[in-house]
Amino acid sequence: MVMRSYRDYTPNARKQDIPEEGRHKPCKKLTRGKISGNGRNNRGVITSRHRGGAHKRLYREIDFRRNKLDIVGRVGSVEYDPNRNAFICLINYVDGDKRYILHPKGMGIGDIVLSSPNASISAGNALPLTKMPLGTIIHNIELKSGRGAQLVRSAGTVAKVIAKEGRLATLRLPSGEIRLVPRDCLASVGRVGNVDISNKGLKKAGSKRWLGRRPKVRGSAMNPVDHPHGGGEGRTSIGRKKPLTPWGRVTLGKRSRGKKCINPLILRRRKSS
């Protein structure tokens, strides 16, 4: 019997590869099960359209508090996390504890990390804002001391310390917002890794389905009962002066963000639509 071999001819087959970060099994002690809501609320009503059908995932417990103070840790592995677009690092501490942290750009296996007020200004170290010089680039920032990081956690993002006065530090966030944060809050030095995630192509519709994103149907292709743009014979226009949402509100150009209460900690808000 003759075996005939063919070269791959589709972009997905030719260019897709499993990155080195995706070849590690997660630490079992730091994982737990995760149930997808598929865009439904507790009554089963769709509250977020075009969601559902994602690949089954395990949730990795990430240390956003960085409260292992003055204990040296070493990077054991850099791993893929399906629950976020940044990579994560498994840190092996000298006391035997293991924790996951966000992977800073430039950090590799075997590097040393430390969470301490006296830590050096190097990628991955966590220290209070009061100990950071002006111009330091940071990520994984707390809004309240001890609560855990809430800002600048996405892949490739970075904030900068631009001023310190009294008990507050002034930060420039990736969105362009400038806000005040208490100086005793912890932050990690450096930029979040996986900077080129925005350049990654999905290559096929199935890749989107693995991520839990379902197809988006045009309103003009629906029936009138389903969308204000629906109905008509053939490919007709939407029949409206302005495009509308499925719930009948004007969209595409009209500002939809509600007015915000005055927050004295926000010096300049980000640009919003």
From Swiss-Prot:
Keywords: Chloroplast, Plastid, Ribonucleoprotein, Ribosomal protein. InterPro entries: NA-bd_OB-fold, Rib_uL2_dom2, Ribosomal_uL2, Ribosomal_uL2_bac/org-type, Ribosomal_uL2_C, Ribosomal_uL2_CS, Ribosomal_uL2_dom3, Ribosomal_uL2_RNA-bd_dom. One of its GO terms (biological process) is mitochondrial translation. The keyword Chloroplast applies. Its main location: plastid. Belongs to the universal ribosomal protein uL2 family. HAMAP family: Ribosomal_uL2_B (MF_01320_B). This is Large ribosomal subunit protein uL2c. It comes from Adiantum capillus-veneris (Maidenhair fern).
